[in-house]
A protein has these predicted regions:
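Structured, active/binding-site neighborhoods that engage oxygen-rich ligands
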Residues: 1-336
Length: 336
């Protein structure tokens, strides 16, 4: 694989997480009609949180949230240790949540909050994630895709391991494995249909892992969402149908199908995808991060407008380019 191209795709994936997260930050967890009231022109650039936002009050334009922070924790784990272990994930998440006081308030999602508190109290991590079915696993999973270009079996195995402490349900693993499989395929492929096929492979394989839990089928909801985006309806009608019928909430079986649908709707153009996520309503920052991770891996960092990466770095100092370089080094070394 061309080293420069691999770098561009990995960088694009991480940039998609951060830019999607930051663009959806001001509208995060707001209903669609409330977003239209607060932002009558729509959100088509990085904006500050509206005053009094229930989670992001006072945050500035371009600022990222937990989605990007947790993604980089998983990237750190892989870059430091060369593998993903459930213990390593739990250790990283607990240290981070303690550092930023996330065990108080709404910053930490419901599955992670519940499970990490139990783990801190000494619970067995093979038990703590058995009812975790929300989208936190999918929002932070992209490093698993980045670690295994083209190797979907390894993606599914590592996804189940990463989900174990907090999201050890078939539903959460299916969503996360779908996203990570899309990314792992996009690193080595410029055909969107193949990446979508990989997503469905990951969803189906993920459903065989973890504890059994009930929820709407991610596979069937995604198929329905894809029919919707190919129906010829107007952009606004498709957004409203995704919001009302597929859903854009914190459930994995809402957020992940809608994210994949947005990627297909805009043929993998990451800026259009994350703009749609910021305006669609519901869990906008997380849908932006998930859809952005897939579109960014598909299109590469070159697929974003030029101002995006400098703005994200100026506000957040994440060093995403360095992260991408370190991934490439690790993957090229492992290949030799
Ligand atoms: Mg967030």
């Amino acid at each position: 694989m061309m080293r420069q191209k691999l770098f561009d795709k990995i960088y694009g994936c991480l940039l998609g997480v951060a830019a999607g997260d930051a663009m959806g930050m001001p509208s995060s967890l707001l209903p669609a009609d409330e977003i239209q009231r607060l932002f009558p022109e729509g959100i088509d650039s990085f904006l500050p949180a509206p005053p009094g936002h229930m989670i992001h009050d006072q945050m500035v334009a371009g600022e990222i949230t937990d989605d990007t922070q947790q993604t980089l924790l998983l990237a750190d784990l892989f870059l430091e240790t060369g593998s993903f272990t459930a213990e390593g994930v739990a250790r990283k998440l607990i240290a981070w949540a303690d550092r930023i006081n996330a065990f108080d308030g709404l910053y930490l999602g419901p599955s992670s909050m519940r499970a990490l508190k139990l783990i801190k109290d000494g619970a067995d991590i093979s038990k703590t994630g058995l009812i975790g079915d929300t989208n936190g696993a999918s929002m932070r999973i992209s490093p698993v895709g980045l670690a295994h270009p083209g190797d979907l079996e390894a993606v599914v195995t590592d996804t189940a391991e990463v989900c174990k402490p907090t999201h050890n349900t078939n539903i959460a693993i299916a969503g996360a494995a779908g996203v990570a499989s899309f990314i792992a395929t996009a690193l080595a492929c410029d055909n969107l249909e193949e990446c979508v096929d990989a997503y469905f492979y990951g969803v189906k394989a993920g459903m065989q892992r973890g504890g059994k839990w009930t929820g709407a089928s991610i596979q069937h909801r995604t198929e329905w969402a894809l029919k919707l985006v190919r129906s010829g309806k107007t952009e606004k009608d498709i957004w409203s149908n995704l919001y009302n019928y597929i859903g854009t909430g914190v459930a994995t079986s809402e957020a992940v199908p809608t994210s994949l649908a947005l990627v297909v709707m805009y043929a993998g153009d990451p800026w259009q995808v994350i703009r749609a996520a910021a305006n669609i309503g519901g869990d906008c920052d997380t849908i932006g991060a998930i859809a952005g991770s897939m579109a960014g891996a598909f299109a590469g960092a070159d697929g974003f407008p030029e101002h995006v990466a400098p703005k994200i770095e100026e506000v957040n100092h994440l060093g995403l380019e360095q992260y991408a370089n370190r991934f490439v080094e690790k993957l090229v070394l492992a290949d030799d």
